[in-house]
Swiss-Prot record:
It comes from Arabidopsis thaliana. It is found in: Plastid, Chloroplast. GO terms for biological process: riboflavin biosynthetic process. GO terms for molecular function: diaminohydroxyphosphoribosylaminopyrimidine deaminase activity; zinc ion binding. It holds the Pfam family dCMP_cyt_deam_1. This is Riboflavin biosynthesis protein PYRD, chloroplastic. SUPFAM superfamilies: Cytidine deaminase-like (SSF53927), Dihydrofolate reductase-like (SSF53597). The gene is PYRD. The lineage of its organism: Eukaryota, Viridiplantae, Streptophyta, Embryophyta, Tracheophyta.
Length: 426
């Protein structure tokens, strides 16, 4: 049952915590308005804030409703966990991004996220933040707490020691070392456990980590730009590589990017501009078609300590040597250049996600692209449609005669300035 009411004035009500009247509720977790404090026999519908509202309209409290048999705010707090986890985007591989909040009497008393591999997990930071207030509180965490000793102690034991009353989990950990054992340990300790709250949101955030755990391969996405008549374009849209642009965010999100050797002079400019991750850039993977090209690529670029790392792949017949050149560029020699071997290299380096960027000389990457489709190694496609009509027939996607029809699932689109961005899954 849903009961709605007209906006009402609330100047005479003194809440337990300050009310942020204009900003979004998510702007400051310690200032979340606790509606429970307004409960009275005459106003029982104040139990739950309608989550379609982004905040409060000053000076009135907007649409309220009561929902039967729904626990207050589980989804809201799990979305907060996801927001926290994404603060470490691009920094955690081979670990997942995880966020945690501790809630007591309707207030967030602690929060944390996993910043990078080897550092404490989200639950530890959140429990430290909450201190003694964690006792009898509810812990929300986007991924099942670990139950083993690795580089850090088990998070299950930290939650048990803190005497939390309840744990709400976004998704079960696909890591076979953890899988459901964390849930079992918490239940055995007498803690109430709820699983699969905002599960799809939590899964999407860590699709690279999940794919790596289930398949032993990094998550691989294909990106390209095209004209409105279906020709590949050797550029990205205006502002796409600037801070906040979709391409800059992609470079922040993915652990490695495969590029055409024709872009070798532009490598220093192919980097994420996102402020929170400006010093951590994806590994740039270049495929050299011959020994001369391999030598030029390895010797002509100096890798800065804080800049993108460059790895050149070359075939054995090119008579190159594996190793790192004086300029800091790594050379990897393979029996034969193929996508599967490159992905194995990325997996062994602890990478969760790889972006195949179809720019520059597409012929450089056609073998890898064909491998991706024929061996079903591609999971996602990202297409930027630019407002242009091209007359270059040789760059028509249809010219790739080996390419078979593919069904794209969960296709989404959004307009970015004059371009349209399409994203979907194979």
């Amino acid at each position: 049952m849903q009961i709605s009411c007209l906006p009402i004035s609330i100047p005479s009500i003194t809440p337990r915590t300050s009310i942020p009247l204009l900003p979004s509720l998510s702007s400051n977790p310690r200032r979340i308005f606790n509606l429970t404090s307004l409960q009275s026999p005459n106003h029982c519908f104040f139990k739950r804030l309608h989550k379609s509202q982004t905040g409060f309209s000053n000076p009135v409290l907007a649409a309220m409703r009561r929902e039967e048999d729904v626990e207050v705010d589980d989804s809201f707090y799990m979305r907060k966990c996801v927001e926290l986890a994404k603060r470490a985007i691009g920094c955690t591989s081979p670990n997942p991004m995880v966020g945690c909040v501790i809630v007591k009497d309707g207030d967030i008393v602690g929060q944390g996220f996993h910043p990078k591999a080897g550092q404490p997990h989200a639950e530890v930071f959140a429990l430290r933040d909450a201190g003694e207030l964690a006792e009898n509180a509810t812990a929300y965490v986007s991924l099942e707490p670990c139950n083993h000793y690795g580089r850090t102690p088990p998070c299950t034991e930290a939650l048990i020691k803190a005497k939390v009353r309840r744990v709400v989990i976004g998704m079960v950990d696909p890591n076979p070392i953890v899988f459901s054992s964390g849930i079992s340990r918490l239940k055995d300790a007498g803690i109430d456990v709820t699983v699969s709250v905002e599960e799809e949101l939590c899964k999407k955030m860590n699709e690279g980590f999940i794919h790596r755990m289930l398949t032993g391969k990094p998550f691989l996405a294909l990106r390209y730009s095209m004209s409105v008549n279906g020709c590949l374009l050797d550029k990205i849209g205006q502002g796409a590589s600037d801070s906040g642009g979709y391409y800059s965010k992609l470079l922040q999100e993915y652990d490695a990017i495969i590029l055409s050797s024709s872009l070798s002079d532009e490598l220093s400019s192919i980097s994420s501009q996102e402020a929170i991750n400006v010093s951590i850039q994806p590994i740039q993977i270049i495929v050299a078609s011959n020994a001369q090209q391999s030598h030029i690529l390895a010797s002509s670029h100096t890798v800065e300590e804080s800049g993108p790392k460059v790895v050149v792949f070359t075939a054995k017949e090119s008579v190159a040597e594996s190793g790192i050149s004086s300029s800091g560029v790594e050379t990897v020699v393979l029996e034969k250049i193929n996508l599967d071997s490159i992905l194995d290299y990325c997996y062994n380096r602890g990478l969760c996600s790889v972006l195949l960027d179809l720019r520059g000389n597409v012929k450089d990457l056609e073998v890898l692209l064909r491998d991706g489709f024929e061996q079903k190694l591609l999971q996602k496609v990202i297409i930027e449609v630019l407002p242009e009509w091209s007359t270059k027939d040789e760059r028509q996607i249809a010219s790739m005669k080996w390419l078979e029809s593919k069904h794209v699932k969960d296709l989404q689109s959004k307009q970015l300035g004059g371009s349209v961005l399409l994203e979907g899954y194979f």
